Regions:
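Glycine/threonine-rich phosphate-binding loop and adjacent beta-strand/alpha-helix elements that clamp
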Residues: 11-187
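Short, small-residue-biased leader/transition segments that mark boundaries at the very start
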Residues: 1-2, 6-13
Length: 187
């Protein structure tokens, strides 16, 4: 996947990245399922990566994982990932999405030091999708996907117990260690 940019701020809780097309939205049926997505990098807090067009069909069957080397200026934060198929005419539809936190991916008992590199893995629900020849894959990374996922306060601790929020500045470190793991199905 080709990089467009690799750092982004989180937003205040009044300006979150909205869920648009999702597999676990319980608040409104209008946003559920695979829906037409906005353009790549449509907000300053969304980083998009786009592949070259595929020469042949790509059957995906199972759990998609997005491995990222990241850093932030706070002691915990969330990272979301949304994988999409971009058709030759430019229309993009979400395939799957997921979320994780830095704390969730640390070994038991360890804490994150702001500014250090951390490895996170966004694990998505199992699925079956065939990306068509001529289409591209697009991955959007952010720190919110609301209301599909609860708002992260950018403080360490249990999300639901936090009384305040703050803006975090995220970085995705490209190269070895940051990649998308696709479960491919051979016909």
């Amino acid at each position: 996947l080709h990089r467009r940019r690799h750092s982004f701020p989180t937003r205040r809780s009044s300006d979150l990245v909205p869920s648009h097309g999702a597999e676990s939205v319980l608040t409104t049926i209008a946003e559920a399922g695979s829906l037409l997505q906005p353009e790549p990098d449509y907000r300053p807090d969304v980083v998009s990566f786009v592949s070259a067009p595929l020469e042949k069909a790509l059957p995906i069957c199972g759990q998609i994982k997005v491995h990222l080397n990241v850093s932030t200026d706070v002691d915990d934060t969330a990272f979301t990932a949304k994988l999409m198929e971009v058709f030759p005419d430019g229309r993009a539809y979400n395939i799957r999405g997921g979320i994780t936190t830095i704390a969730a991916d640390l070994p038991e008992g360890q804490t994150y030091t702001p500014g250090q590199t951390a490895k996170v893995c966004v694990e998505m629900w199992d699925m079956n999708w065939t990306v068509q020849p001529g289409s591209c894959l697009r991955l959007d990374v952010s720190s919110s996907d609301f209301p599909q996922y609860a708002v992260h306060s950018n403080y360490a601790g249990v999300w639901s117990e936090q009384e305040k929020t703050r803006i975090a500045h995220q970085k995705i470190l490209l190269g070895e260690g940051s990649f998308v793991e696709l479960p491919l199905h051979e016909n």
